[in-house]
């Protein structure tokens, strides 16, 4: 019974993903990123932004530990955010929201996007990255758009 349930959920996730790509459009149609035609096709390196959104720390002082770790109050949140802001500053303003969405796409919520994380909180963290970095207004991803 569990296997059947897991297969049904996996099929639902796969069909949703397929429908998302076959329908077309994207969050830029809703607003909050705009101008994706002028943006480069390749995804910029925003690894620190992904770590910031997912609340992970990767620093040299954690070198022997290679697995992602949750940060703690007073830990490395500020360091990761500063690296993220530095990476975002190298992207054209009209392309930032598209780049942020692209870097976290498929990374939310654990395995296959099911459980394992607070997806709503992570999406909110991604949307407010530009204002956290003093780079303009927040991104606006469509509601219910969980990749």
Swiss-Prot record:
Cell location: Membrane; Secreted, Extracellular space
Chain positions listed as propeptide in the UniProt record: 20-28
PTM: Five disulfide bonds are present.
A GO term, aspect molecular function: serine-type endopeptidase inhibitor activity
Position of the signal peptide: 1-19
InterPro entries named in the record: Allergen/soft/tryp_amyl_inhib (IPR006106), Bifun_inhib/LTP/seed_sf (IPR036312), Bifunc_inhib/LTP/seed_store (IPR016140), Glia_glutenin (IPR001954)
Tissue specificity note: Found in endosperm and aleurone layer of developing kernels, but not in the embryo.
Family annotation (SUPFAM superfamilies): Bifunctional inhibitor/lipid-transfer protein/seed storage 2S albumin
Coiled-coil parts of chain: none
Primary subcellular site in the record, as a coarse category: membrane
One BP term from GO: defense response to bacterium
UniProt KW Plastid keyword: no
Keyword annotations from UniProtKB, A to Z: Antibiotic, Antimicrobial, Disulfide bond, Membrane, Plant defense, Secreted, Signal, Toxin
Gene Ontology CC entries for this record: extracellular region; membrane
Protein function: Acts as a membranotoxin, probably through its antibacterial and antifungal activities, contributing to the defense mechanism of the plant against predators. Forms monovalent cation-selective ion channels in membranes. Contributes to grain texture and hardness.
Name assigned to this protein: Hordoindoline-B1
